[in-house]
From Swiss-Prot:
Keyword Cell membrane included in the entry's annotation: no
Listed Pfam families: Ribosomal_S2
Family: Belongs to the universal ribosomal protein uS2 family.
Gene encoding the protein: rpsB
Composition skew (Basic and acidic residues), residue ranges: 294-303
GO terms of molecular function: structural constituent of ribosome
One Gene Ontology cellular component: cytosolic small ribosomal subunit
Coiled coil: none
An example Gene Ontology biological process: translation
Protein name stated in the entry: Small ribosomal subunit protein uS2
Amino acid sequence: MAQITMSEMLKAGLQFGHQTRRWNPKMKQYILTERNGIYIINLFKTLDLIDVAYDFIKTTVAHNGTVLFVGTKKQAQEAIKNAATRVNMPYVSERWLGGMLTNFQTVSKRVNRLKELETMDFDDVHGSGLTKKELLLLKREKDKLERQLGGIRNMTRTPSAMFVVDINKEALAVEEAHKLGIPVVAIVDTNADPEAVEYPIPANDDAIRGIELLTNLFADAVAEGLLERSGNASKSESNSEQPMAAWEKELLEKNEKATLRENAVVTENEVKKTDEEEGASSEAARADAQNEEAVAKPGEEVE
């Protein structure tokens, strides 16, 4: 359960929503009252939703999952970076690049380019065999990539979940996560649609103290999950598999079927002789795949 009190939330100003003329009707269920033209959020409901989201993050990390922290608005950048770094999780605190998730393969190539540039000594003109201007351009390229991709340099695959500050600001990130079936935990203010994410946290998404409080809270959930993962690993390595999203399972099954087809084709004569056997084996494979699916747990261009 999340270790947070109503007093902490009130002091951080999480109860203050937007002006009444700037609201999303779907947030009505989380609004307590209106005061001086500003909506007041019902923090009792927020607490309940925090507990649910906290347990989800903890469980996800405990099963070897990763959580991507996202917050590019000025009030959230430092909190996102510090919290994610503390628990060794990936983060995006600068501009979200289109395709960061949906075109992850290309993004990975840019990350590799960043790592390559980091090995260079930009002060060694003679040893590099490059001119000062060429080295300067390469250094600028490295600095730009560091700002854009430094937070995900160690993310080798798409995340298992995302924590987002302000879903209106990070609409593209949320959209990409949904396309890949990645659950989203997000701070949702009174001007946003709580149904746009799986785990909404109704709260003020503009107050720096409030953002820090909630971001650190979910970083604590990650930390608890890491501790639980460590305990599970010492008992059994079989519990360390990362839960796969539905799209990952589908891709894996397609690759497995493609491999089976390649191995099955030897020569035309052999195929004709063993046609019935292969047919039976293919039916069995499909039956096994269906059984596994039934048992399995459901889950701008890049510059």
